[in-house]
Amino acid sequence: MEESRESPAEHGYYMPAEWDSHAQTWIGWPERQDNWRHNALPAQRVFADVAKAISKFEPVTVCASPAQWENARKQLPEDIRVVEMSMNDSWFRDSGPTFIVRKRPVKLSSLNRNIAGIDWNFNAWGGANDGCYNDWSHDLLVSRKILALERIPRFQHSMILEGGSIHVDGEGTCLVTEECLLNKNRNPHMSKEQIEEELKKYLGVQSFIWLPRGLYGDEDTNGHIDNMCCFARPGVVLLSWTDDETDPQYERSVEALSVLSNSIDARGRKIQVIKLYIPEPLYMTEEESSGITQDGEAIPRLAGTRLAASYVNFYIANGGIIAPQFGDPIRDKEAIRVLSDTFPHHSVVGIENAREIVLAGGNIHCITQQQPAEPTSVAENGH
């Protein structure tokens, strides 16, 4: 596996949009008893449903720990690859690599692949005092292992960053939240300008849209963008929304809308906002909380906690949209309709019982990581 000391942008790489063609999707397999209830069995069924849904559109690789490999293999169809990999938890959007591509080799680049991966630093969303669990040593190696398996060049970065904290349009614009990226539990030594500079060098972006805050209740990640707002296509975003002025989310959504309405992207386009209504407020039940082993190794999951449920946390596959369903008949149906209208060339697949994932702090986008298709160089075609 090649490694490089120069920045990805110097080699011609950039992060493509999620709707660009994929080679495959990576997913981790849940097992932490202190985060997933009933020994993670209900969550495993939903993860399997997500993997199966995506596999109808593109190849899927599921990574499972040595103790869970056989169980994962049994629960998943044969066309889904299952590989053994240790992890502290199964949030591959955040512990997995950020894949980057280039259209053609750059003259002075020593790297011969048109795909590479960024291996960011990771501290379990906050480090020793604020993180979601005490030991993330296995998670730190996930990106490196995935890139080694695929023999893809690796760019390592000391900056702490999770994939769920960035969204790009593939045309130079990056969407982020101040709540997460400027949080003192991530990179306290870096200014906003320094963070932008590093993301320009590593993601190949030129401009940023900073939303002040993420989704209300998304305390685990300190307001990841992927639960709040995402690009649907260049110049168009989907924004988590509520009309209920008594819901603390209302203020956040209005604030974000104001920023977006006054923003232009890297190509000079005004941003069009499509509102994607959140479900009616969901809370962890006593029964759900009691099914989780609360042993002090991970943050407690308490009954009555507002769940960070949002339909923006969907995944774009090749020709498919894999979207969470929360058991709210009106909002679930409406989310499918809005996503179908927004992505007319994709089939929208709703995943029932996505609540099992949100009980542990994330959703479908958080558990998936796309590996883009490697662009074929013009030079390789002999033109």
Swiss-Prot record:
Coiled-coil residues are none
Its UniProt entry gives the catalysed reaction(s) as: agmatine + H2O = N-carbamoylputrescine + NH4(+)
Q: Where does agmatine bind?
A: D220, D226
This protein's record includes keyword Phosphoprotein = no
InterPro entries, per the entry = Agmatine_deiminase, Peptidyl-Arg-deiminase_porph
GO BP terms in the entry: polyamine biosynthetic process; putrescine biosynthetic process from arginine
Q: What is the effect of changing C366A?
A: Impairs enzyme activity but does not abolish it
Q: How does activity depend on pH?
A: Optimum pH is 7.0.
* Pfam families reported for this sequence: PAD_porph
Q: In which pathway does it act?
A: Amine and polyamine biosynthesis; putrescine biosynthesis via agmatine pathway; N-carbamoylputrescine from agmatine: step 1/1
Give the UniProt keywords, A-Z: Hydrolase, Polyamine biosynthesis
Question: What is a GO molecular function of this protein?
Answer: protein-arginine deiminase activity
Q: Which residues form the active site?
A: C366
- How is activity regulated here? Inhibited by N-ethylmaleimide and iodoacetamide.
EC number(s) in its UniProt entry? 3.5.3.12
| Protein purpose | Mediates the hydrolysis of agmatine into N-carbamoylputrescine in the arginine decarboxylase (ADC) pathway of putrescine biosynthesis, a basic polyamine.
Assembly behavior: Forms homodimers.
Family (UniProt): Belongs to the agmatine deiminase family.
What is this protein's name? Agmatine deiminase
The coding gene here is: AIH
